[in-house]
């Protein structure tokens, strides 16, 4: 998601490219699965007819409050927002009497309002409680997880989700501090501990970057949510419906790329070679990255990748 160029500023990444790819029928029913501060949603609404509809979803209650109260609230009758993870899309649609949609947009990752608010605990740039939950009403904070997990488990999380080669040393230091009666409870404490444990540093990158990323992904089950959300898209999209995903990390993009590719070709069951191939359900349409001007204006956009696919159902009998 990564909206913003500074504290509490919200510059939506790949805004026009994403919405242009998503909205192919102005009368359609669309879903913004990651509302954030509404950058994509507002542009989607501007492209819909009076008959069009937009369901927005966000697991962060602050995002829902932003859409429903205050000066920035959305009053358009074609718009509705739900507080939920986008992986729950099928149930949310069923509750509204909707079976199929014309498009789903997912803008993956943490947003600038989350990063820039020290109380949310996502960033090492300012001290705050080590929370990291995108939905503070659900689940376990990063501090609570680190207060109970063993060294091997912590190291695996930091290595697998942060691709941090000093994961074992960091985990060892975390557990040693906990056993000494000083568990890490703030972002500042975690950043200082990691800086001491990491022996070599990447130019231009804070040594705590990978550890913070790993814990955030783990605490919010982000990769599982993404996998479930993509499966939900396949279930809910109409033939011709669009799946538009913006990701900011190779772990996320790899999941999206693999999912689209795996459903973009007919598959022959080698155990039954004379049976008809399994249907091709998606067609890849585009892969885009921000241009130089956008990256210059918003450095957080530099790692973004936009992928677009269309549901086809080729090979399925009518």
Curated annotation (Swiss-Prot):
It comes from Methylibium petroleiphilum (strain ATCC BAA-1232 / LMG 22953 / PM1). Keywords: Cytoplasm, Methyltransferase, rRNA processing, S-adenosyl-L-methionine, Transferase. Specifically methylates the N4 position of cytidine in position 1402 (C1402) of 16S rRNA. The gene is rsmH. Its main location: cytoplasm. It is found in: Cytoplasm. This is Ribosomal RNA small subunit methyltransferase H. It comes from the Bacteria. GO terms for cellular component: cytoplasm.
